[in-house]
């Protein structure tokens, strides 16, 4: 007796329909193309091989109490240039009795965790009771220049020429010594014949290189005394006070001249010392000062100014019972491109009150890893391009955009059954199993989607009648990816310029940046909608080709025992081919594996340079589809006599 065996429709109401370009899908499940990510609080880096840290005892491996004294891991401590008791400002000025460490090193991203050793607790005087304002200005200049340089170094000995009448001086309020920078020089005079002394003329040279470190710009402390009145300085009738630095052309670049500038007018009778931070190019400079006193620059920090990169400043404060300042915090917040890491609780150490704080260890644990994005809001290492909330600037790397969860397109998942495509770009193959808008029937295929985005099905189908070549899909991906990049390039340039200018008190610029980023997010969501439709078509056509191969295999296995009378239907004589014979022909998985479509592995990679300077919108969408068709045990067939 002859019977007709056909593949039977298997879609029910539990399936959802997904429309795509080139084919549609029914699916038992669905999932969002990307999940929202949440930034992790604290510091991290984009590349472990291109960052350097500058620290003190809390990052010093040579500290006898390490690692209990540290706020970082052993791995991270290896990246720091540190010495217990040190700080960049201590090395700049060299107050007597304090640690003097040669800070130098190179890295695209610089992390600063130091500063606490010069704070009110240190009680440094030397003609100034409160150094916090000078520290604020110093740290701000360090962060600014570090963000534009690959290498930086302390220059701890400048070439200089001192007038013969001047000798090194000391001060009682400076431990009967004085700072290493500036150095104090005095003239010994004998009233009344030589009561005033001679005007001082000195020279110093800022080098173009210090050791192996190139110096294109120097940070110099221009220090001078401040007198409340002419009478305070001019007790001997020696005219007005001045201390001025000139460049080689005679231009004033620093200092104070009370011959043209007024005195403070306060009632004090003891001078104070002020130090302005000035940025100077290499060269020879002259210093002129009024008789008796000369403050001479002896040190600088030099920067090569070769590469822009991120700067992270970590809040550096004491534990209980020691007075701290917040100059590091204020300096970073007022410097474009500086990310500040702040504690929420008082510093509580493990080794002692001031070393080994658990909260700080957690905030700095991200330095052990590489992140895709670093920002003031924290760091992200997930590949999703979306986050629930806007990441605060500054930010660097491939940073996600703010989006609402419901706005992210969904893709089919779980059990997938394709329908035929109607897209005009898909040509008809020589042989098709399923007509236009027919549901795939009979066999269920599981599509395993390993990531979020599939290939673009652009190009010609194979002459054998199924699918799209991997090469043509990749070319489609490349074309659309390039088109999207072209559309983004002008916006990226504008964002880069904005990030160069943005600071925490420029609210208008921040608002504009936020508006642009929101527009970028909406545009990306639109792009993903297109990608989702292409993905659906990709899977649909791929499964159709697999079914075509399956039908061909059925016909080949049947030989003369079954005759294909239409796509997906065969006539068989059950007197000749009994049940076991039919099982061999139709129930593949019980006897042999079903031939499956080769995995589709096509990618889209829309990204900027991972060190894209200042870009809050550097973005990467990297994903792949690996598609495998598997036959579920128990073929559903329709038999008619």
Curated annotation (Swiss-Prot):
Principal location: virion
GO MF annotation: an example: sialate 9-O-acetylesterase activity
Region ranges (N-acetyl-9-O-acetylneuraminic acid binding): 137-296
Disulfide bond residue pairs: 6-569, 106-151, 126-174, 196-238, 215-302, 223-275, 332-338
Glycosylation sites: 12, 47, 130, 381
Topology of the protein relative to the lipid bilayer: Single-pass type I membrane protein
UniProt-annotated catalytic positions: 57 (nucleophile), 352 (charge relay system), 355 (charge relay system)
Subcellular locations according to the entry: Virion membrane; Host cell membrane
Annotated segments matching region Fusion domain-2: 352-637
Top-level taxon of origin: Viruses
InterPro entries hit by this protein: Capsid_hemagglutn (IPR008980), Hemagglutn-estrase_core (IPR007142), Hemagglutn-estrase_hemagglutn (IPR003860), Hemagglutn_stalk_influenz-C (IPR014831)
Record EC number: 3.1.1.53
Catalytic activity: N-acetyl-9-O-acetylneuraminate + H2O = N-acetylneuraminate + acetate + H(+); N-acetyl-4-O-acetylneuraminate + H2O = N-acetylneuraminate + acetate + H(+)
Example GO BP: fusion of virus membrane with host endosome membrane
Keywords: Disulfide bond, Fusion of virus membrane with host endosomal membrane, Fusion of virus membrane with host membrane, Glycoprotein, Hemagglutinin, Host cell membrane, Host membrane, Host-virus interaction, Hydrolase, Membrane, Transmembrane, Transmembrane helix, Viral attachment to host cell, Viral envelope protein, Viral penetration into host cytoplasm, Virion, Virus entry into host cell
Chain positions covered by the region annotation Esterase domain-1: 27-137
Region described as Esterase domain-2: 297-351
Gene Ontology CC annotations of this record: host cell plasma membrane; membrane; viral envelope; virion membrane
Transmembrane segments: 617-637
Topology Extracellular: residue spans: 1-616
EC top class, as a word: hydrolase
Similarity comment text for this entry: Belongs to the influenza type C/coronaviruses hemagglutinin-esterase family.
Subunit structure of this chain's protein: Homotrimer of disulfide-linked HEF1-HEF2.
Function (record text): Binds to the N-acetyl-9-O-acetylneuraminic acid residues on the cell surface, bringing about the attachment of the virus particle to the cell. Plays a major role in the determination of host range restriction and virulence. Class I viral fusion protein. Responsible for penetration of the virus into the cell cytoplasm by mediating the fusion of the membrane of the endocytosed virus particle with the endosomal membrane. Low pH in endosomes induce an irreversible conformational change in HEF2, releasing the fusion hydrophobic peptide. Several trimers are required to form a competent fusion pore.
Protein name: Hemagglutinin-esterase-fusion glycoprotein
Organism: Influenza C virus (strain C/Hyogo/1/1983)
